[in-house]
């Protein structure tokens, strides 16, 4: 089987909801990382076979946002592009599809990743095309209905986290402690400059003067403490345990990697960041969608012929502290090797981009530590999981 490698990885800093990136459309964020990933790899735009980008909230974004991002990044019109939506797994699924295309001989070099601007998701007015004869009409928030709502049980993703907390005995205290840990790790990583290499600046136009370079994750809480979190009320169930502080945020950002065969990398004289060892997808009950990483990770590890104990480093997305803790409980891996620089609770969760964002962070930290075996995994709204294993020589 063809060995598939990742030769470069880049992401934007993650913006908070209504923050620095709020006015930058998702395709423009995608263009920034596509261009940066190619430049870092030393690959020319015309050498690219295809661009695959995840984006969940596409209402009002225009035709095929991935194609828009590719064109804005300077790729020639002859290079095709595809937008995919696998909710929170979109950015990682894009990388899997890139690997598929290369292994099948359909492509030589693929740029894959994800982009999202949750701040810009529009409200829509269902039924308005035919008009309203009388009575009130209701605006629907596409961010919630298309990104955060369990269509099968008609409740918010937060309720699925409450379900996990009850089923696996995850207490409020444990969730808050986990969230504080994520924030503290991310704050320390920021101060140590650990994200600097993976982040490409986004130029934010100003009303007057030169654009401002946005290059620092702005959702991270400085000086987070258990006391500051423990007083918050539950966000989804009055008698529940999930709060705004022990859940991930609503965020904006993008990430991309350049994928090719090991033979192509050798031909071009490129040193891979890692080889894609295996990947897997899985389904679970939508009521406990946060458990998706368990079967997906087990499947990916089995295909790689690894055990959880073989892993040197992991990025396991923190949609909610409750589900992250339950996943760690079920997998039995060394949690000191998981999200060592904080996770989505601190950094943020721009849903279409997060799959690739955690992969980018994983690859850069593996390089820093000279780690050999890594795993990226996410839960997915609707009851699924994705996981991808990478190896450095």
From Swiss-Prot:
Involved pathway(s): Biopolymer metabolism; poly-(R)-3-hydroxybutanoate biosynthesis
Active site feature: 88, 349, 379
Stated pH dependence: Optimum pH is 7.8 for the condensation reaction and 8.1 for the reverse cleavage reaction.
Protein's GO biological process: poly-hydroxybutyrate biosynthetic process
NCBIfam families xrefs: AcCoA-C-Actrans
Domain of life: Bacteria
Protein name: Acetyl-CoA acetyltransferase
InterPro entries: Thiolase (IPR002155), Thiolase-like (IPR016039), Thiolase_acyl_enz_int_AS (IPR020615), Thiolase_AS (IPR020610), Thiolase_C (IPR020617), Thiolase_CS (IPR020613), Thiolase_N (IPR020616)
Originating species: Cupriavidus necator (strain ATCC 17699 / DSM 428 / KCTC 22496 / NCIMB 10442 / H16 / Stanier 337)
Oligomeric and partner information: Homotetramer.
UniProt effect for mutating residue 379 to S: Almost complete loss of acetoacetyl-CoA thiolase activity
Record's catalysed reaction(s): 2 acetyl-CoA = acetoacetyl-CoA + CoA
GO CC entries: cytoplasm
Subcellular location: Cytoplasm
Enzyme Commission (EC) number: 2.3.1.9
Pfam families, alphabetized: Thiolase_C, Thiolase_N
Upper lineage: Bacteria, Pseudomonadati, Pseudomonadota, Betaproteobacteria, Burkholderiales
Activity control mechanisms: The condensation reaction is inhibited by free CoA. The cleavage reaction is characterized by substrate inhibition by acetoacetyl-CoA, which is partially relieved by free CoA.
Family: Belongs to the thiolase-like superfamily. Thiolase family.
Function: Catalyzes the condensation of two acetyl-coA units to form acetoacetyl-CoA. Is involved in the biosynthesis of polyhydroxybutyrate (PHB), which is accumulated as an intracellular energy reserve material when cells grow under conditions of nutrient limitation. Also catalyzes the reverse reaction, i.e. the cleavage of acetoacetyl-CoA, and is therefore also involved in the reutilization of PHB.
Keywords, comma-separated and alphabetical: Acyltransferase, Cytoplasm, PHB biosynthesis, Transferase
Entry's Gene Ontology molecular function annotations: acetyl-CoA C-acetyltransferase activity
């Amino acid at each position: 089987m063809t060995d598939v490698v990742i030769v470069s990885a880049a992401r934007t800093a993650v913006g908070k909801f209504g923050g620095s990136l709020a006015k930058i459309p998702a395709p423009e964020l995608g263009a920034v990382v596509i261009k940066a990933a190619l430049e870092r790899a030393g690959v020319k735009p015309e050498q690219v076979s295809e661009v695959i980008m995840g984006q969940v909230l596409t209402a009002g974004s225009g035709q095929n946002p991935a194609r828009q991002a590719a064109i804005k990044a300077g790729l020639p019109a002859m290079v095709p592009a595809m937008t995919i939506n696998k909710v929170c797994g979109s950015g990682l699924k894009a990388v899997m599809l890139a690997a598929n295309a290369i292994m099948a001989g359909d492509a030589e070099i693929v740029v894959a990743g994800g982009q999202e601007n949750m701040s810009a998701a529009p409200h829509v007015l269902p039924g308005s095309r035919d008009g309203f004869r009388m009575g009130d009409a209701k605006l629907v928030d596409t961010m919630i209905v298309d990104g955060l709502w369990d269509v099968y049980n008609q409740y918010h993703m937060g309720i699925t986290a409450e379900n996990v907390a009850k089923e696996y005995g995850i207490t409020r205290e444990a969730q808050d402690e986990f969230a504080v840990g994520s924030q503290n790790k991310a704050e320390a990583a920021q101060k140590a400059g650990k994200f600097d290499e993976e982040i490409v600046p986004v130029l934010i136009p100003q009303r007057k003067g030169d654009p401002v370079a946005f290059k620092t994750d702005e959702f991270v809480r400085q000086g987070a403490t258990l006391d500051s979190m423990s007083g918050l009320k539950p966000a989804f169930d009055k008698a529940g345990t999930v709060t705004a502080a022990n859940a991930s945020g609503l965020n904006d950002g993008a990430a991309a990697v350049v994928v090719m065969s090991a033979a192509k990398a050798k031909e071009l004289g490129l040193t891979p960041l890692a080889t894609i060892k295996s990947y897997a997808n899985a389904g679970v009950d939508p009521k406990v969608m946060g458990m998706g990483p368990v079967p997906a990770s087990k499947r990916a590890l089995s295909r790689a012929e690894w055990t959880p104990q073989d892993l040197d480093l992991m990025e396991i997305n923190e949609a909610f502290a409750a589900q992250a803790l339950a996943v760690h409980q079920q997998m039995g891996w060394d949690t000191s090797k998981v999200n060592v620089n904080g996770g989505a609770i601190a950094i943020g969760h721009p849903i279409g981009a997060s799959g690739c964002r955690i992969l980018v962070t994983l690859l850069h930290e593996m390089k820093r530590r000279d780690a050999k075996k890594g795993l990226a995994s996410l839960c997915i709204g609707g009851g699924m999981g994705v996981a991808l294993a990478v190896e450095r020589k």
